[in-house]
A protein has these predicted regions:
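Long, low-complexity intrinsically disordered regions enriched in acidic and polar residues
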Residues: 1-356
Length: 356
């Protein structure tokens, strides 16, 4: 995607810079970008066009580029479908077939990106983790993966943007979950809340000696019918791809695991996401889920509430949401499992789940 203007246009395609912006601002950023299309085999990771894109991604500061199209780009939904682009992803402006694409001849590469790009023995997974630990923005890591710049030579390939986002979130969150295994559990039942773009979040962290995670999503359709999506993992990890919640699952899991890693703690986590379609009128991508959960868990925002029982914590988590606690409970597999386990233990050890 290229902006039709000169200067530093980083904010137009950099979710990390969008906190505090309105949905109108973000849609405006996206619609100002023109998307050029060229069709390539996924195994084609060389050639003038691909290498130009790779240079742009590795640049340590914004660089100039020029795109010439076969004909005037148009914002046509049917055209987007024909070109295989995902119309459910963040919006973007006009799209058209590229004729020529050129970049500035004075691009200086970010050394962190350059190292993993030229390391042809480094596995893609390890490259992703290395870049994350060195402070590279997630959106940049996702683009590096998408352009076939990570992994051993024989395994490098182009990756659709949506897949690269999910793969990056999954890889980093799995690494972080593994890293917190030996940490002490949180002391109390903790609840965090945050809302933006018509997305309302409640996160419950539960004292436990093992990691478990569940994400629930609830929404009302145009007819007023309630919809639910739920995916979860226990201490053994995911048994299959979380097809109900999909990429949002990994985005939320990354934010939670990241927070626990910084605190040097571990917990079982429940994430409730309620979507108000009258406010969330245009989907802006799973980045808003990751950033929404991050903001909820941000220590500086002082949003944490502590409780001594799972029931009171869960009740508080549901209290600011339109969907009733009964519905959230009915659709939650992990919460009901935890309740059954705690009731059984409480029968033999009264007061075990209350601080003295």
């Amino acid at each position: 995607m290229v902006p039709p203007i000169h200067g530093d246009t980083t904010i137009l395609d950099k979710p990390e810079k969008w906190h505090g912006k309105s949905i109108e601002d973000i849609v405006g950023y996206r619609l100002s970008l023109v998307r050029g299309v060229m069709t390539y085999d996924i195994h084609t990771i060389t050639g003038k066009y691909i290498e130009s894109l790779q240079e742009l991604v590795m640049a340590d500061k914004p660089a100039e580029s020029e795109a010439v199209f076969e004909k005037k780009p148009v914002p046509d939904v049917d055209q987007l479908k024909r070109k295989g682009l995902d119309i459910e992803s963040p919006p973007f402006g006009p799209v058209g077939d590229l004729k020529i694409f050129r970049t500035s001849c004075s691009i200086k590469a970010d050394r962190r990106l350059e190292r993993v790009y030229y390391d042809r023995d480094l596995k893609a997974k390890n490259g992703i983790i290395s870049l994350y630990e060195k402070g590279v923005d997630l959106s940049t890591i996702q683009r590096v993966l998408s352009l076939g710049m990570l992994g051993s030579t024989k395994n490098r390939r182009l990756v659709p943007s949506r897949w690269s986002v999910t793969a990056t979130d999954d890889t980093i969150s799995s690494y972080l979950v593994k890293s917190i295994e030996t940490n002490n559990a949180v002391d109390y039942y903790e609840v965090y809340k945050y809302s933006h773009f018509g997305n309302y979040y409640s996160i419950v962290l539960i004292p436990d000696h093992v990691w478990s995670f569940e994400m629930q999503e609830a929404w009302f359709d145009k007819q007023g019918n309630l919809g639910f999506a739920v995916d979860f993992e226990d201490a053994n990890g995911l048994k299959q791809y979380p097809s109900s919640v999909a990429g949002a699952y990994f985005a939320a899991r990354l934010a939670v695991a990241e927070y626990l890693s910084k605190r040097k703690r571990k917990a079982t986590a429940l994430v409730l996401r309620e979507i108000h379609s009258e406010e969330y009128v245009v989907p802006v991508g799973v980045w808003q889920i990751r950033e929404g959960v991050r903001q909820a868990l941000d220590d500086k925002s002082n949003l944490k509430k502590e409780f001594e029982s799972l029931e009171t914590a869960y009740k508080y988590a549901c209290s600011s949401l339109s969907v009733s606690e009964i519905e959230w409970t009915r659709n939650s597999k992990l919460y009901r499992n935890l309740r059954r386990t705690q009731l059984s233990i409480h029968h033999f050890f009264p007061g075990m789940f209350h601080k003295q």
